[in-house]
């Protein structure tokens, strides 16, 4: 019984939501889309912000990304 439930849960989580990082990424994507029509310079920092939030668990990777964007 537990095995079946785990399998179902895994399949449900493997959806697009998991791929996008859950609602967290979705929330950050909303403002990013609003800034899309704006200048390209705004897109750079905005994108980094979204990635930074996603890489909150990896401070090392976050630092590298921030430096690269700068």
Swiss-Prot record:
Any one biological process term the GO annotation gives: eye photoreceptor cell fate commitment
Regions of biased composition (Polar residues) lie at 45-70
The record's annotation in Pfam families points to: TF_Otx
For whether the record's keyword set contains Nucleus, the answer is: yes
Domain of life, source organism: Eukaryota
UniProtKB keywords? Developmental protein, DNA-binding, Homeobox, Nucleus
Regulation: induction: Up-regulated by FGF2 treatment in embryonic telencephalon primary cultures.
Where is this gene product found?
Nucleus
Q: Give the molecular function GO annotations.
A: DNA-binding transcription activator activity, RNA polymerase II-specific; RNA polymerase II cis-regulatory region sequence-specific DNA binding; sequence-specific double-stranded DNA binding
Q: Name one GO cellular component term.
A: cytoplasm
Question: What InterPro entries does the entry give?
Answer: Otx_TF_C
Region annotated Disordered, chain positions: 34-70
| Functional summary from the UniProt entry | Transcription factor probably involved in the development of the brain and the sense organs. Can bind to the bicoid/BCD target sequence (BTS): 5'-TCTAATCCC-3'.
Please give the family membership noted in the entry.
Belongs to the paired homeobox family. Bicoid subfamily.
This chain's protein is named: Homeobox protein OTX2
Lineage of the organism: Eukaryota, Metazoa, Chordata, Craniata, Vertebrata
């Amino acid at each position: 019984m537990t095995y079946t439930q785990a399998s179902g849960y895994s399949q449900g989580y493997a959806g697009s939501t998991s791929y996008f990082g859950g609602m967290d990424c979705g929330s950050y994507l909303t403002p990013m889309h609003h800034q899309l029509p704006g200048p390209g310079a705004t897109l750079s920092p905005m994108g980094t912000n979204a990635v930074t939030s996603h890489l909150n668990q990896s401070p090392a990777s976050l630092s590298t990304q921030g430096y690269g964007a700068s």
